[in-house]
Amino acid sequence: NGKNPIVAHEFLGDNIDGKDIIIIDDMISSGGSMLDTAKQLKRMNARRVFICCTFGLFTDGLDAFDKAYEQGYFDKVVTTDLTYLPPELYSRPYFIEADMSKFIASLIDFMNHDVSLSNALATTEKIHGILEAYNNRTNIEFLTRD
């Protein structure tokens, strides 16, 4: 039937009470498992929940996401522009598009110049910069609810 039933969501780690949580997956198909996870995290008193994926397909439409957002189960959905996104998604207050055009252009440029892709793919320093900005609470207004 195309569905992948999830038997259980298990959380391993410290208490998440009052913390911001990021759920990361490669793809949102219908979004059911992501929304179930977000709901469970909110029940565990997560402060904010951010859903992130590479490919946001939204095969069952946006109604379930709209309802879950209205119920406060998540704060933002971030997905790349590496696949078709339904036009109505852009009007949703919870949606953030991660523009990958510069990254893809860099990959093409590296390949055209026969240069190793390792520098383009080694994003550890960028991640550390984002975490530092977050920890300093600077330049993160895009993460707040509208």
Placement of each model-derived feature along the sequence:
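PRPP-associated nucleotide enzymes
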Residues: N1-D146
